[in-house]
Amino acid sequence: MEGDVGIGLVCQNTMDGKASNGNGLEKTVPSCCLKAMACVPEDDAKCHSTVVSGWFSEPHPRSGKKGGKAVYFNNPMWPGEAHSLKVEKVLFKDKSDFQEVLVFESATYGKVLVLDGIVQLTEKDECAYQEMIAHLPLCSISSPKNVLVVGGGDGGVLREISRHSSVEVIDICEIDKMVIDVSKKFFPELAVGFDDPRVQLHIGDAAEFLRKSPEGKYDAIIVDSSDPVGPALALVEKPFFETLARALKPGGVLCNMAESMWLHTHLIEDMISICRQTFKSVHYAWSSVPTYPSGVIGFVLCSTEGPAVDFKNPINPIEKLDGAMTHKRELKFYNSDMHRAAFALPTFLRREVASLLAS
């Protein structure tokens, strides 16, 4: 650990704010908990990796002290709460041009990847996210051939796509090479996805990459992006979804990470509403991931004009794909029953989004 302060307080250095691009707080904040970000300076609105007395927690230190004690602010994505993990050892900490990257060994969830103070994955429960975000769309269409991953620098989504033998090309556009390098070193079970010869890696901005892509190139696009804070807000706005739709074939599918139903109902509504203006059909599914805020994460699934897509009933079931169940490693979370169950929404969320999801 670094930087002992006072009574066993150990804090990592704060970021320099490069990822904000100077524009993060000037964008319109969606009508959800992100409003909390607007009341603190830009550098402080970013989350920083903090280890206090051997525990990692998502609140982060603001510069300076108050009354002799470090001042902590809630993460703007989920004000008023944070998940903590006991840290056995910090394995890596550095700043890329875009974000702070932290890897530590936890007491209960194995190794943990943290970006700008937000847990991205743990060895124990990554399967509940990686498997669902990949197979929900790919098992909903017949024989996908060209697939694009936006983000996904840890390689987990690539690992899951590689189970599908029909896929011929897997493009991945990741802006931060450090995430890829760190994953290859500390998370080889995920980064094995990069070893697939079908993978074509592109380092750069996804929006720019999509603008240069031929129209109708992809059967499926999977957006494994960071939370919509600062520059990433553009990834939940209409122009980006229009760019995604343009890159899909008729009947092509999109699966986009879509936050927590317990914390971001308004943001989910905003995303579904925007997608309804752009795509033929829109659905919402979810998965249980213990180390994500509130323990759940959602996905918006969309299809373009063309052959109808029945997302709720997999027509390309993973169980019938040759070797898919054990390719690279055995599936731990996803199966066809979990696929169908993922679209069952609790009553409170169904009330909120029913009119938006209606055909």
UniProtKB/Swiss-Prot annotation:
E.C. number: 2.5.1.22
Keyword tags: Polyamine biosynthesis, Transferase
Keyword set includes Isomerase: no
UniProt binding sites for S-adenosyl 3-(methylsulfanyl)propylamine: Q99, Q130, E174, D205, A206
Positions of the PABS domain: 53-304
Binding site for putrescine: Y292
Induction note: Up-regulated by abscisic acid and salt stress.
Residues the entry annotates as binding spermidine: Y129, D154
Tissues expressed in: Expressed predominantly in stem internodes, flower buds and roots.
Active site, UniProt feature: D224
GO molecular function: spermine synthase activity
PROSITE patterns for the chain: PABS_1, PABS_2
Catalytic activity: S-adenosyl 3-(methylsulfanyl)propylamine + spermidine = spermine + S-methyl-5'-thioadenosine + H(+)
Quaternary organization: Heterodimer. Component of a multiprotein complex. Interacts with SPDSYN1 and SPDSYN2.
Family note: Belongs to the spermidine/spermine synthase family.
Protein name stated in the entry: Spermine synthase
Native source species: Arabidopsis thaliana
Lineage: Eukaryota, Viridiplantae, Streptophyta, Embryophyta, Tracheophyta
Gene field: SPMS
